[in-house]
C-alpha cells in the first residue's frame, strides 16, 4: 500500500492513497477465519465454521469491516511517513475523498494536529485595569440594606386598620358553591398586603380591616388557574384578622456584626470592612465579565498567529449551527433541510467566529501551562455544587447531569480561563 503525504500547514496534513482490492480481500479472508472460530452454525462444530460459509452469512459486514481495517492501515502508514507523533493528533480525520473504483478505493483524508504556540509576548495584550473602590456611602447603604433584611416582625402596639404594605396574620377558609375546597384553609397565616401572593382581589379587601374583625371576601379564580376545578369560579373566603405586624429595624452595632459574621470577636467596623470587600468584588466581577474578559480574549486572538486544526473548527461550526437550529421554527428548519446551499452559506457566515473561538481555547490552554494555572476536579465539583445550591437545585442531580452530558470539561476550561485572566489582570 502506497500513500502520499502533503503538509497543508502546521496543524493539518493530507494523506492520499489507493486501497487495492487484494488488500480488502485479504482482510475479508482474515476476518472470516477469525469469526469462524467463534461462530456456531448448524451442520458445523462450534469454532469450525469454514470461511466461505461465514462470508455467505455475513458478507456485507465483513466487507465493511475489511475496508475499515484497510483504511486505518492507510492512515497509520501516512502518520508514520509524515513523522507525526500520535499524541499530537486531534479528533477524527476529515474525509475529502472515498471513491470506490474497479481497481480499488481512492482515499484522501486530512489529519489535524495540536497547534504549536510560542507563549511569548502576551503580557502586552493584557488591558490596563484600575481596581474599583467602595465609597463610604455605598458601605452604609449596604449595611442598612442588611439591617433591614435582619429586622424582625413585631405586632404593632397601636390597634389601627390594615394599610397597603402591612404584614398581617390571618385565619381564612375558602368556599366554592358553599363547599370548602382543598388547600383553601389556613390559621395564623402571615401575608404581606400588596405582595400578590393571593389571587387578585383578595389582598385588596383585607385593607381597612381591624383587629379581631371577621369578614367574608368574594373573589374569582383566574381562568388559567392551576387547579382546573377552581379555574374561573367565584369563591368566598371567611377571614379573621389577628394582628398587624411591622419590621423593627435591627440596631447597627457589634451584636449585629457578630450575628452576621458568626464571630464573637467581630465588631461593626469588621462588618463594614467585609462589606467594603464584597462591594469591590462585585464591581470587579461586573467589570471583568462585561469589559475585561471580552477585551483580553480579543487582544490575545489578535496577538497570536498559528494554524488551526480544521476538524476542530468544523466541529465548532457544527455546534454553532445546532445552537441556531434549536432557536429556529419548524418552517425555518425545513427550509434549511431542503436548501443545502443555505446551510453552506450559514457555515461560512459562522466560520470566523468559530475560528476565533477555537483559537482562544488553544491560547488559554497554552498560557495556563506557561503560567502554571490549574483547576482540579474537586474545584469543578465545588463550583457546580455552589451554583446548584444558589439556584435551589439538588447539587448531586446537577453534577450527575453534567457528567452524563459530558459538560464537565467545558466547565473546567471556563474556570481555567477565568483563573488565568484573573492572574494576568492581577485580580
From Swiss-Prot:
InterPro entries: PPIase_dom_sf, PPIase_FKBP_dom, Trig_fac, Trigger_fac_C, Trigger_fac_C_sf, Trigger_fac_ribosome-bd_bac, Trigger_fac_ribosome-bd_sf, Trigger_fact/SurA_dom_sf. Involved in protein export. Acts as a chaperone by maintaining the newly synthesized protein in an open conformation. Functions as a peptidyl-prolyl cis-trans isomerase. Keywords: Cell cycle, Cell division, Chaperone, Cytoplasm, Isomerase, Rotamase. The keyword Cytoplasm applies. One of its GO terms (cellular component) is cytoplasm. Its EC number is 5.2.1.8. This is Trigger factor.
Amino acid at each position: 500500500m502506497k500513500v502520499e503525504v502533503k503538509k497543508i500547514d502546521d496543524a493539518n496534513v493530507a494523506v492520499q492513497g489507493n486501497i487495492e482490492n487484494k488488500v480488502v480481500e485479504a482482510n475479508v479472508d482474515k476476518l472470516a477465519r477469525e469469526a469462524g472460530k467463534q461462530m456456531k452454525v448448524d451442520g458445523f462444530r462450534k469454532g469450525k465454521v469454514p470461511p466461505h460459509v461465514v462470508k455467505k452469512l455475513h458478507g456485507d459486514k465483513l466487507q465493511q469491516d475489511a475496508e475499515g481495517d484497510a483504511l486505518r492501515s492507510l492512515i497509520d502508514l501516512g502518520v508514520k511517513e509524515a513523522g507525526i507523533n500520535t499524541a499530537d493528533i486531534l479528533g477524527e480525520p476529515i474525509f475529502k475523498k472515498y471513491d470506490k473504483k474497479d481497481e480499488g478505493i481512492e482515499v484522501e483524508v486530512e489529519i489535524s494536529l495540536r497547534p504549536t504556540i510560542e507563549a511569548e509576548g502576551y503580557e502586552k495584550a493584557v488591558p490596563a485595569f484600575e481596581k474599583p473602590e467602595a465609597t463610604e456611602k455605598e458601605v452604609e447603604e449596604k449595611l442598612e440594606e442588611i439591617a433591614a433584611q435582619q429586622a424582625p416582625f413585631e405586632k404593632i402596639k397601636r390597634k389601627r386598620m390594615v394599610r397597603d404594605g402591612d404584614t398581617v396574620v390571618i385565619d381564612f377558609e375558602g368556599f366554592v358553591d358553599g363547599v370548602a375546597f382543598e388547600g383553601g384553609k389556613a390559621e395564623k397565616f402571615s401575608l404581606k398586603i400588596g405582595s400578590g401572593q393571593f389571587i387578585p382581589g383578595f389582598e385588596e379587601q383585607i385593607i381597612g380591616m381591624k383587629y379581631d374583625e371577621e369578614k367574608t371576601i368574594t373573589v374569582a379564580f383566574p381562568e388559567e388557574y392551576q387547579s382546573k376545578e377552581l379555574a374561573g369560579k367565584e369563591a368566598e373566603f371567611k377571614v379573621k384578622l389577628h394582628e398587624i405586624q411591622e419590621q423593627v429595624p435591627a440596631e447597627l452595632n457589634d451584636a449585629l456584626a457578630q450575628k452576621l459574621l458568626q464571630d464573637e470577636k467581630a465588631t461593626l467596623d469588621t462588618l463594614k470592612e467585609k462589606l467594603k470587600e464584597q462591594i469591590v468584588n462585585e464591581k470587579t466581577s461586573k467589570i471583568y465579565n462585561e469589559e475585561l474578559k471580552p477585551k483580553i480574549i480579543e487582544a490575545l486572538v489578535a496577538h497570536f498567529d498559528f494554524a488551526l486544526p480544521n476538524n476542530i473548527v468544523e466541529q465548532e461550526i457544527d455546534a454553532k449551527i445546532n445552537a441556531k437550529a434549536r432557536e429556529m421554527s419548524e418552517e425555518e428548519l425545513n427550509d434549511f433541510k431542503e436548501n443545502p446551499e443555505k446551510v453552506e452559506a450559514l457555515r461560512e457566515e459562522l466560520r470566523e467566529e468559530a475560528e476565533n473561538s477555537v483559537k482562544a481555547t488553544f491560547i488559554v490552554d497554552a498560557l495556563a501551562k506557561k503560567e502554571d494555572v490549574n483547576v482540579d476536579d474537586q474545584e469543578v465539583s465545588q463550583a457546580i455544587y455552589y451554583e446548584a445550591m444558589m439556584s435551589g437545585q439538588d447539587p448531586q442531580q446537577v453534577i450527575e447531569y453534567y457528567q452524563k452530558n459530558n459538560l464537565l470539561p467545558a466547565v473546567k476550561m471556563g474556570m481555567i480561563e477565568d483563573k488565568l485572566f484573573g492572574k494576568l489582570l492581577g485580580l
